[in-house]
């Protein structure tokens, strides 16, 4: 039976001694990551050679024997080994063009440590981590799931910049049974004014989470700018700013989860555009609004939830002119300005709402993609009919 990895993220409440030990572990993980990355770069610059995982593992052993770095042995070796594995995997993803070049880690950002099965134990009194004298208290958020029976393969202990602690349990579970078919498909046109418009005519408003918190965030950032560097007050104020950002991030993620789950439950096939978000944010006037929508995260949620539910997410070519094509007769306009929200097809006289028309075309194109076994969908430029447009602002 196929297995799927599921993550359960819960709040953790370490005591003072545990927090000190975990922060020390975070620091050691960060040092190992940064020194390994620096050595990789130095070796490639001088010798034009890569570095294998075995070589980084040998270097870590040598560092622990160095009197200047012997404090690396005060924490569990498992998170340090995992840091090496993750960096090796990160370079593999980079060379395969599936990720960015690995970057150095900062002590000011999110801190984390990964523990495999050999370095933790789940007991009734809490989570026992390697080299800790007391169990870490966590708050389990799924009353219908017994944590003791999950058998996690890995746990990740993390601390956010706003001071909150979390534990993430990675669990391999059996592939869930697919949802029953409902016989409905949908095209989704993502936007800024409205987060999404569906081919059914439904409009999902953009909650604009950043806009609702922007005033308070600016106030806290001004206070932070007035604080003296290195002072305790600056550290406290910096945490308040991070907490504001966390509220925005959590609210956006909650909205994306609920929206994606609703679509996966309601439709057998979901068509979306392959938006070039990285290119779109280069527009200075729209970059902030686009970044606040979370289109990329929304697509990722749709894809993994659909896979687990036995649904289909079909990505339509980004150059497909969904807004300029009449969904009734297929007439293709020569041009359509961004400010035009309604237009009348000169071919059949149908009056279109720009976004609903685009969503319907995306749904149709997604069906063609499935019929063509995943082939790209673009109208034939040689046969597409072009003509003037009757625009209605």
Regions found by a protein language model. Give the residues of each.
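Positively charged, low-complexity nucleic-acid-binding target-recognition regions
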Residues: 1, 5, 289, 293-393
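Gly/serine-rich nucleotide phosphate-binding loop at the start of the catalytic core
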Residues: 1-79
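Stable alpha-helical structural segments in soluble proteins, enriched in small hydrophobic residues
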Residues: 36, 83-94, 356-366
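Substrate-contacting helices/loops that form the catalytic groove of nucleic-acid
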Residues: 43-69, 151-152, 159-299, 370-393
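Acidic carboxylate diad motif detector
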Residues: 54-160
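Hydrophobic residues embedded in beta-strands of well-ordered beta-sheets
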Residues: 120, 125-129, 164-167, 195-196, ...
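Secondary-structure transition/turn motif
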Residues: 126-138, 169-174, 200-202, 347-349
């Amino acid at each position: 039976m196929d297995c799927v990895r599921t993550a359960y993220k819960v709040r953790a409440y370490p005591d003072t001694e545990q927090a000190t030990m975990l922060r020390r572990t975070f620091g050691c993980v960060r040092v190992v990551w940064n020194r390994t990355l620096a050595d990789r770069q130095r070796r490639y610059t001088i010798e034009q050679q890569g570095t294998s995982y075995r070589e980084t593992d040998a270097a870590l052993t040598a560092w622990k024997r160095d009197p200047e770095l012997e404090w690396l042995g005060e924490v569990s070796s498992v998170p340090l080994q995992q840091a090496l594995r993750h960096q090796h995997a990160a370079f593999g993803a980079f060379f395969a063009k599936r990720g960015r070049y690995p970057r150095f880690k900062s002590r000011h950002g999110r801190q984390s440590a990964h523990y495999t099965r050999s370095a933790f134990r789940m007991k009734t009194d809490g989570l026992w981590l390697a080299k800790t004298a007391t169990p870490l208290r966590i708050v389990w958020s799924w009353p219908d799931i017994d944590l003791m029976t999950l058998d996690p393969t890995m746990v990740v202990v993390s601390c956010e910049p706003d001071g909150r602690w979390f534990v993430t349990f990675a669990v391999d579970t059996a592939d869930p049974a697919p949802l029953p078919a409902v016989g409905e498909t949908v095209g989704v046109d993502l936007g800024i004014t409205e987060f999404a418009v569906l081919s059914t005519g439904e409009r999902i408003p953009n909650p604009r989470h950043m806009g609702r918190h922007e005033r308070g965030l600016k106030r806290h950032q001004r206070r932070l700018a007035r604080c003296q560097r290195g002072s305790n007050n600056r550290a406290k104020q910096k945490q308040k700013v991070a907490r504001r950002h966390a509220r925005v991030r959590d609210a956006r993620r909650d909205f994306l989860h609920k929206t994606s789950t609703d679509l996966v439950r309601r439709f057998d096939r979901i068509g979306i555009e392959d938006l070039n978000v990285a290119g779109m944010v280069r527009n200075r006037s729209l970059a902030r609004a686009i970044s606040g929508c979370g289109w990329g995260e929304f697509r990722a949620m749709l894809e993994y939830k659909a896979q687990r539910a036995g649904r289909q997410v079909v990505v339509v070519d980004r150059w497909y002119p969904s807004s300029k094509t009449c969904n009734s007769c297929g007439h293709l306009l020569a041009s359509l300005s961004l400010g035009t929200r309604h237009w009348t097809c000169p071919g059949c006289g149908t009056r279109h709402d720009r976004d609903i028309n685009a969503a319907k075309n995306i749904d149709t194109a997604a069906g063609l993609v499935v019929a063509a076994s995943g082939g790209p969908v673009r109208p034939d430029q040689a046969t597409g009919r072009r003509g003037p447009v009757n625009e209605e602002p």
